[in-house]
Amino acid sequence: MNTPETFVYDMCHGLAKAHPELEFVEKFKIVKKVDINDDKVSLISGGGSGHEPAHAGFVGKGMLDAAVCGDVFASPSQVQVYNAIKKCATDKGVLLIIKNYSGDCMNFNNAMSDAQEDGIKVDAVYVNDDIAVKDSLYTVGRRGVAGTVLVHKCAGAAAEQGKELEEVKAVANKVIDNVRSFGFAFTSCTVPAAGHPTFEIGDDEMEFGVGIHGEPGRFREKIDYSKGTFCDDLSARIVKDLEEDLKLQKGEEVVLLINGFGGSPLQELYILNNSVTKVLDADGIKIHRTIVGNYMTSIDMAGASITVLRVDDELKKLIDYPVATPALTWGAAMGAQAEAAVEAMNAIAKALNITPGAAPAAAKKAKKASADEDDANAVYEVEGKPVIGETINTAAFVQIVEKMADVIIENEVPFCEADKMGDGDFGMSIAKGFKQLKADWATRKKGDIGQFLVSCSEIIKEYCGGASGPIWGSAFKYAGKAMLGKKEVSLTDIAFLFTEANRGVFETGKKSFGKGADIGDKTLVDALKPCAIALTKAAEEGKKLREGLDLGAKAAHEGAEATKSHVATLGRAGTVGERSIGYPDAGAHGLDVIFNELAKYIKNFK
């Protein structure tokens, strides 16, 4: 690669250049068909990058119309998803296919709400095929993994046949109800920005129930090659679990997907397929179609997942329906892929009113004109000199937020390392947003403290990766609205600011999952809410500003430390359950570091 920062951009540009029927909308990291058919339902999926070919590799005839690409292992922002919906909206509507992860659900749901308010017909389904996560303790529920590819395939075929939005959604949900997956790994994976594996595992060990973001699995055990039947024994164990969970009966038919995680050679995947097929045959389960290869990967992880989809006559026809995408092609659609490329180039030429040969130059001009318009942003200066006494004025508050951004950026790698029980991207996800905030500093409105915070929330919401975007963006937005019109804040105001920030986080979770995070759920709220409570108490007791802030920072630290003994119930760390005990929550730890650094900064401010 060139750099971790350009990893996704370079990859998507390369994909589009190899497949001229596709285009890459760089500003919003969207890979889409050049020609959107207004006579069919558009399908949009996406998520964090690092799972290629999912999801951009499945954009094409018979599957997706667009894929929204987040940073590696971080969901795309709601702004990205919203723009994908706008670009792909048709008279028949749009269906979002969402993998069941906190960040994906938050950002896709928020984008869907925005699009619906604009009058766009859009609906969604949620894929949760991973049986490794089965305990009712986990409020987010099972993860969406390789079974998502089969949802794309069947829903895509239904859309291609001209079915209505409600019918396409019903097909997608039918697949979701009948598909199950289970994964295992021999190594972890390495996120480009981190440069080291997300978890450690011995050469003689394997991880059962591993996630596609480098999350540790359900349990770990030693590999035993001594009998010479390792793959057969492994397959029998996993297939039994899949059959039981799906309640498969003798004589039923399935589609079998043997999916590599990116680091296992194709030979091993076919060996695994041989073993799995023998087990299914012995159990009287008929295989309608087998798919073997890398479809939903985890960068360079050595390992695989086994997916079974129970099929009836309807699903068999949809699975067999012709498809032409970069990563999946069969049937009459083989020729359609070249056909689609020609159609795409003609569509570009028609839209720009030029000959096909001149399209690239004209497209560059159009893109430059659009970029010039985007650059026409106003610049805002803050009035007066920064002052901190028993109140903090706007100029000083702006400096404090800038210091906060510096702390986050400086701790990008340590914050990633703290995210061992999640997917290891917390530091990268939040630092990305605050780097952008610093880059756009001059364009943030600074008329008063509330206006400034709300203005910051727009950048944070769009550029912080994964769940961090909606969570931190909401915290800033709610805090900002509470401070609108204030040009200076006291300890009492700051306590209310933190209380409202916590409410923003709670309401965001409630909107997406029906339950907002509270103390004990092992999230950043374990640090944020105690801090808000301590600040409120200090203000009520008449404490001085700096003393009150110290007490708030101390409460945040104690809350973050307490998460070591908690079982994670929300977010990606929630999927590992009791294995999260002994590790602090990454978000709570991050707030602990940030609040304590800011308390020191304010104490020493002159």
Regions found by a protein language model. Name each.
Residues M1-K606:
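N-terminal loops that bind phosphate or other acidic moieties
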